[in-house]
Structure formats: structure tokens, C-alpha cells
């Protein structure tokens, strides 16, 4: 009988232990108060954008929203102009974009993103990005039912395209975790030097052979880390939370590998007094917030999010988590770990609708903890508001 098999028994016990751990862990709740900053406390200003969904056409629509959503990339250009003005008045330390930079990972979309970014060099020097499911897992913009075969080079092409784009943005400032030494290694730029010819050949030919040889490259690139400038400074740990999917209907699934979680431990040991932003695309657990439809609750949180929450517990008073994915504006905490979910400054309605994003200020609060001060909301007026003015 199958239920008498030792593997079946072991699986049942493991599932029971997992459920007990999930039930016993702290539950997410809204952030009831913000930290206060002493005069001697250090502060870091972080602009948090997410899900900007850049399209490759001037009047292009998005996969998710179609004709009921925004067109083109004017809203992103407006956000960058606002950031440039904010930075000139009160300097920022970081502009963090937590995934879904593009709408479908196409080369034209990446080109449009860089076309906007290059107009604001001061902001470009502050930007750190990470991949979202739309950058990697959208098989076909026009046909959600289309499959990517596991051996298809198209998925690898989207991965390589993303890595190349991230290197252009932050190649000199982030370092790659070395699994052999269990310490931070070379910069992203240096790590890719020996693969440049191979990447260029794959981009030209798209062969399965080159796709296989580049398979490990994507895996070993995460986490990327911008280390703190001082022993007790602020560092940024960039995770890849995207599951390896081959079907558009499952493209939103997320998971953080155990290798990345172990790397976080080693990085924290290397910088024991540092503060951290842990940045990823997907939200860790379901939050205590109402949704309009059931589909928003299905398959969008991390598959192993509760496990990762428990794992990050060791960083709770020295870290905050920042993410995007569902375009939800939420600030809360779970077991002492502050979590910030970013709204999308682009999505959420047509170009007539107003959108917004936040500039957060992190501080060295009482007791040496990392605190979150009240955020600065930056409004982006829609065309309707602009006409009214």
C-alpha cells in the first residue's frame, strides 16, 4: 500500500511540521507607528519604485491592463523628472526599482527604459534594479496560452537580456556572492567579463547549445549585493524571486532558493553591524488587506514565503524588506521585520488617473535598530488633473 511506504510517511510528517511552523509564526499586520530619529541618528533616503512595465511603443498598451490601462512611457518619464527635482532639493541615497521593469522582457522595452534613464544621469547613478516576472516569464504578449518548452532558448534569452541590462545599470556597484568562499566576490561587471563573447554569440544565434552553457550563469548571479560603505552603514541585498515557469498563466509564481537564503546568512556574518534593505519582486506572505477579486490571492505570493520570513528573522531589527509585484501600497511588519510593498507609479488606470510612489527615509533608531520614518508621497498627476490645473 502506498500509505505504508516510508517516503509517504516522511512526507506526511514533513507537511505536518511545516503547517505547525506556519501556524506558530507571527502574522503580518499593518505598521501602526513610524520610528523617530535622534539628532545623531544616521538617515538614508530611498525612492522606491516598482512595476513600471515599460513598453516598446510610444502608444503601446500593457499585457495586464490592455486598453483599460496606460499607454506608452510618459508616466515613467514624469516619475524620473520628479525624482530629479527631489534629488536636487534634498539628495537621495538610492532609487530602488523592485522588478517588472519591462512589460514582457523585449529588447525594445529595455531600450525604451534606458532611453528615459539616460536623460537623468544624476538619478541613473542611484538606481538599483532587480528582475520581475514580466521581465522573464511572459512567453507571448498576444497569446497567454502559449508554452515555452523547457529547452527553449527564448527563456534563456530573456534571462541574458535582463542580466545585461542590470549590468548596464549597476554593474560597477553591486557584487556577486561567491559560493566557494562564502563571501562577496567580484562586481557584476567583472563577473560577466569572461562571458561577454558567449552572451553576444547567443544573442545572435539563439542556439540550444549556447543556451545550455549559459544556464548556470543566471543562477549564480543572485543575490547581488551593494555592500555598506561603512561597517554600520546601509547595504542592499538583491534577490531573484522568480520561479522557473514556462507558461504565461503561471508566470507570476515566485520562490526564493535555499542557496540565496544561505547567502543572506553569510553576508550578514560578513557585515555583522550593517543595516540592510532586502529587495525582491514578490511579496512574502498574504497581507491583512482586502482585495477586489479572488484571483489576486492565487499564486502571487512566494511559494516558500513563510519559510523565508522565518529565515529573515535573524535580521529583523537591522533590515527592512522592499518589494512590488501586486501594485499594492502597504507598509507593515511581521515578527518585527518591517515590510514595504510599493504601488506602481504607472499601472492602476488609464493615463487620466493620478498615480504616486514614495520616498522612504530609513534611520538608525533607538537601540541601534533600523527604523522607518514617515514616508514622503510623490504624486504623479494624470492628464485629467493636468487639464484641470
Describe the residue ranges of each PLM region.
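A short C-terminal boundary segment appended to hydrolase-like catalytic domains
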Residues: 362-389
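Active-site neighborhood of phospho(di)ester-bond hydrolases with catalytic His/Asp-centered motifs
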Residues: 48-50, 93-100, 126-133, 239, ...
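Conserved beta-sheet core of the metallophosphoesterase superfamily
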Residues: 288, 293-367
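N-terminal active-site segment of His-dependent metallophosphoesterases
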Residues: 2-112
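Beta-strand-turn-beta hairpins that frame and shape the catalytic cleft
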Residues: 36-47, 220-238, 274-275, 333-339, ...
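Extended active-site neighborhood of metal-dependent phosphoesterases/phosphodiesterases
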Residues: 112-262, 311
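Active-site-proximal segments of metal-dependent phosphoesterases and phosphodiesterases across multiple
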Residues: 243-262, 269-319
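Active-site environment of divalent metal-dependent phosphoester hydrolases
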Residues: 53-58, 103-105, 133-141, 244-247, ...
Amino acid at each position: 500500500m502506498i500509505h505504508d511506504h516510508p517516503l509517504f510517511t516522511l512526507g506526511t510528517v514533513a507537511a505536518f511540521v511545516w503547517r505547525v511552523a506556519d501556524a506558530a509564526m507571527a502574522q503580518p499586520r499593518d505598521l501602526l507607528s513610524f520610528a523617530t530619529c535622534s539628532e545623531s541618528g544616521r538617515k538614508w533616503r530611498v525612492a522606491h519604485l516598482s512595476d513600471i512595465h515599460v513598453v516598446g511603443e510610444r502608444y503601446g498598451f500593457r499585457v495586464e491592463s490592455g486598453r483599460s490601462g496606460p499607454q506608452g512611457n510618459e508616466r515613467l518619464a514624469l516619475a524620473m523628472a520628479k525624482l530629479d527635482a527631489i534629488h536636487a532639493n534634498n539628495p537621495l541615497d538610492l532609487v530602488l526599482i523592485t522588478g517588472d521593469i519591462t512589460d514582457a522582457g523585449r529588447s525594445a522595452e529595455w531600450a525604451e527604459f534606458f532611453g528615459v534613464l539616460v536623460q537623468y544621469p544624476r538619478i541613473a547613478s542611484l538606481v538599483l534594479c532587480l528582475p520581475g516576472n514580466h521581465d522573464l516569464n511572459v512567453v507571448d504578449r498576444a497569446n497567454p496560452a502559449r508554452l515555452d518548452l523547457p529547452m527553449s532558448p527564448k527563456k534563456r534569452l530573456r534571462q541574458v537580456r535582463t542580466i545585461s541590462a542590470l549590468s548596464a545599470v549597476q554593474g560597477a556597484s553591486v557584487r556577486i556572492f561567491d559560493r566557494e568562499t562564502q563571501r562577496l566576490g567580484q562586481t557584476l561587471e567583472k563577473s560577466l567579463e569572461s562571458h561577454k563573447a558567449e552572451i553576444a554569440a547567443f544573442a545572435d544565434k539563439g542556439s540550444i547549445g549556447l543556451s545550455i552553457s549559459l544556464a548556470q550563469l543566471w543562477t549564480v548571479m543572485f543575490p547581488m549585493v551593494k555592500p555598506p560603505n561603512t561597517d554600520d552603514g546601509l547595504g542592499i541585498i538583491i534577490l531573484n524571486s522568480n520561479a522557473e515557469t514556462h507558461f504565461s498563466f503561471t508566470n507570476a509564481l515566485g520562490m526564493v532558493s535555499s542557496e540565496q537564503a544561505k547567502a543572506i546568512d553569510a553576508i550578514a556574518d560578513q557585515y555583522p553591524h550593517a543595516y540592510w534593505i532586502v529587495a525582491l519582486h514578490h511579496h512574502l506572505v498574504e497581507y491583512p488587506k482586502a482585495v477586489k477579486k479572488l484571483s489576486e490571492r492565487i499564486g502571487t505570493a512566494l511559494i516558500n514565503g513563510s519559510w523565508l520570513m522565518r529565515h529573515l528573522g535573524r535580521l529583523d531589527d537591522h533590515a527592512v524588506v522592499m518589494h512590488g509585484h501586486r501594485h499594492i501600497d502597504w507598509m507593515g511588519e511581521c515578527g518585527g521585520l518591517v515590510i514595504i510593498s510599493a504601488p506602481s507609479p504607472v499601472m492602476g488606470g488609464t493615463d487620466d488617473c493620478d498615480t504616486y510612489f514614495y520616498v522612504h527615509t530609513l534611520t538608525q533608531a533607538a537601540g541601534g535598530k533600523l527604523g522607518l520614518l514617515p514616508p514622503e508621497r510623490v504624486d504623479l498627476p494624470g492628464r485629467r488633473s493636468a487639464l484641470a490645473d
